[in-house]
Structures are given as structure tokens and as C-alpha cells.
């Protein structure tokens, strides 16, 4: 019996350990910098004044618009949500049935236990009250900046950007990852764009090390908070 208990305990421990989300690792290929493509040399047109691939713009800026270009994203995320719910149900009912006379005569019957006369009247009262309330609130904020690269230019001119930033501290590593779609018109003249202007944004802020582990519950605590705990 003791051996079976040990096996079950170890199996549960390994199962709970496997449910823990893996720690993020650097050098994720998805967030790796995208280098600009080397353009193929344009065919030279002998005898022409203008050659393809050598054009310049009279009015141009330094904003990102090609694959491999760098763009700085200003993190300005702030969310706040609250919800209140309450309900109340009340119901009262009563009934009074009195049978004092029937066909002009008094109606009564003898009590089989005491022998005394008793009437046939009845009275009923009932009430029910039910009430409940609930409240929930959540707020988050993230500020800072991260510089990423343009990974793809869509046919409509939308820029797909992604990148990550790792910071090594004395208690571990902190990382910020972001991916999404940026409209070229939303890019400022200093080549920055706010994170609130990114479509389909995927923003991750996480970390590794002793500080990150201290904020996570242990494997036994996760068992008590899991659906496997019957109480």
C-alpha cells in the first residue's frame, strides 16, 4: 500500500510539473531580426537617360517602409475593467380557507385524539427571499519602448513588425516581445509608433530567474488550485 501511495504521489508531481508553462528562451526564431533582401540588379537599358533602380525622391523621409527596416514602438498600454452584478427575488403568498357553515348549519368535526369539536378552516402563509451580488475588477499598465524590424510588407502597404528585447538583471532576465501590423501613416517623423496603433498586437512581458520563480505557486499549491482537487 505504501509503495502504491509513493508511485501515485510521484506521478501526480510529474503531471503537475508538466502543466507548468515553459520558461521563455532567447533567440526565438520567430522574433529573430529580419535582414533586408538583397535586390536583384536591374537590367541596364543602353542609350536611355534614366535607369531602373536608380531613382531618387525629391521629398523623402527616414520612416520604415521596407523589409528589414527598423522601427521603434512606444509601449503605452493601459486597460481597466470592472463589473458589478446584483439580483434580488422576493415572493410572498398566503391562503385562508374558512368553512364555518354548510347548508345553513355549522360545520365541525370531532378531534379523534381529544374528542373536542374543531372547525374545518385552514390557513397557509409562505415567503421566499433570494439575493446575490458579485463584483470584479482588473487593471493593467505597460510603458516603455522597444525597437523591432519590419518582417513583411503586405500588398496594401501594411507593415508586419516583430521583435524582442532581453534585459539581464541581477535576479534573472526580463523580456518584452511584440508582433503586429502597423500602418505607414501612423509612423511619426522620428520613426516611432505607439503600441495602441498596432493592429493584431501580441505583446508579451515575462521573465526568468529567482524573481520570476518567487511569484509562481509551487507544485503542491497548483494541485490544490487545480480542477483535480475535489474540495
Swiss-Prot record:
S-diacylglycerol cysteine lipid modification positions: 19
Cell compartments where the protein resides: Cell outer membrane; Bacterial flagellum basal body
Keywords associated with the record: Bacterial flagellum, Cell outer membrane, Lipoprotein, Membrane, Palmitate, Signal
Lipid-substituted positions (N-palmitoyl cysteine): 19
PROSITE patterns xrefs: PROKAR_LIPOPROTEIN
Coiled-coil intervals, chain numbering: none
One Gene Ontology MF term: cytoskeletal motor activity
Matches recorded under HAMAP family: FlgH
Family listed: Belongs to the FlgH family.
Subunit composition and interactions: The basal body constitutes a major portion of the flagellar organelle and consists of four rings (L,P,S, and M) mounted on a central rod.
Name under which the protein is recorded: Flagellar L-ring protein
Species per Swiss-Prot/TrEMBL record: Stutzerimonas stutzeri (strain A1501)
Organismal lineage: Bacteria, Pseudomonadati, Pseudomonadota, Gammaproteobacteria, Pseudomonadales
Gene name, Swiss-Prot/TrEMBL: flgH
Amino acid at each position: 500500500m505504501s509503495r502504491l501511495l509513493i508511485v501515485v504521489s510521484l506521478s501526480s508531481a510529474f503531471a503537475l510539473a508538466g502543466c507548468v508553462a515553459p520558461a521563455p528562451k532567447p533567440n526565438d526564431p520567430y522574433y529573430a531580426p529580419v535582414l533586408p533582401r538583397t535586390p536583384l540588379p536591374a537590367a541596364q537599358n543602353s542609350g536611355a537617360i534614366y535607369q531602373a533602380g536608380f531613382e531618387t525622391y525629391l521629398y523623402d523621409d527616414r520612416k520604415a517602409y521596407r523589409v528589414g527596416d527598423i522601427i521603434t514602438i512606444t509601449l503605452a498600454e493601459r486597460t481597466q475593467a470592472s463589473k458589478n452584478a446584483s439580483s434580488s427575488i422576493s415572493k410572498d403568498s398566503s391562503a385562508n380557507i374558512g368553512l364555518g357553515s354548510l347548508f345553513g348549519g355549522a360545520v365541525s368535526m370531532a378531534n379523534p385524539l381529544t374528542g373536542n369539536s374543531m372547525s374545518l378552516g385552514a390557513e397557509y402563509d409562505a415567503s421566499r427571499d433570494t439575493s446575490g451580488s458579485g463584483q470584479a475588477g482588473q487593471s493593467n499598465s505597460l510603458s516603455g519602448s522597444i525597437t523591432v524590424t519590419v518582417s513583411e510588407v503586405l500588398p496594401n502597404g501594411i507593415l508586419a513588425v516583430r521583435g524582442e528585447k532581453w534585459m539581464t538583471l541581477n535576479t534573472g532576465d526580463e523580456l518584452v516581445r511584440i508582433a503586429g501590423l502597423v500602418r505607414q501613416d501612423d509612423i511619426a517623423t522620428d520613426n516611432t509608433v505607439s503600441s495602441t496603433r498596432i493592429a493584431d498586437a501580441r505583446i508579451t512581458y515575462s521573465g526568468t530567474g529567482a524573481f520570476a520563480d518567487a511569484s509562481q505557486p509551487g507544485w503542491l499549491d497548483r494541485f490544490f488550485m487545480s480542477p483535480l482537487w475535489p474540495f
